[in-house]
């Protein structure tokens, strides 16, 4: 949070210098012009804190989390490019497929649902569809002031609590956000 907060003056200056704003019009619900770079401080803070946490607690986990961090970085960079220069839908989908592939083919996939173990191909397909679906669901509501941030906060808080109750270290990464 502190890194995000400290980065805001620089982000506002960059938005002003390069005129990177979402301008108010009759279809927008925000009042005034809003920087399109708001997520930059949050994303950079998240990546720095996550990598620092992993390296300071158990550096052997770095390569376990690297595909997920890399996928997040790819989605972030192309999301930023899309905010500044609108990308075609096919380009966004290809980027999502590449990022999702990083995650899945590094062994991160749904292996079971409840007590039921998933067949390998179903596991890959379900994980792929879920990741792409979540990316697009959040992208869809991103233009609605406060909704995406509120839903993200609620989701991460819930996951953090679930991981804490199950003694999973991923809880710390959830709470870093």
Model regions: which residues?
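"…together with the soluble PPM/PP2C metallo-phosphatase catalytic core" -> "…together
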Residues: 1-177
């Amino acid at each position: 949070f502190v890194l995000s907060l400290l980065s805001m003056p620089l982000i506002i200056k960059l938005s002003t210098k390069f005129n990177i704003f979402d301008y108010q019009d009759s279809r927008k619900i925000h009042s005034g012009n809003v920087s399109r770079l708001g997520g930059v401080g949050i994303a950079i803070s998240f990546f720095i804190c996550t990598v620092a946490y992993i390296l300071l607690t158990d550096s052997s986990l770095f390569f376990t989390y690297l595909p997920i961090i890399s996928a997040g970085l790819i989605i972030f960079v192309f999301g930023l490019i899309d905010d500044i220069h609108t990308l075609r839908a096919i380009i966004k989908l290809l980027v999502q497929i590449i990022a999702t592939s990083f995650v899945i083919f590094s062994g991160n996939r749904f292996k079971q649902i409840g007590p039921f173990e998933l067949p390998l191909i179903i596991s890959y397909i379900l994980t792929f569809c879920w990741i792409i679906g979540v990316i697009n669901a959040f992208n869809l509501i991103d233009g609605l002031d406060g909704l995406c941030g509120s839903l993200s906060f609620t989701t991460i808080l819930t996951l953090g609590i679930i991981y804490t109750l199950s003694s999973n270290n991923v809880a710390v990464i959830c709470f870093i956000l």
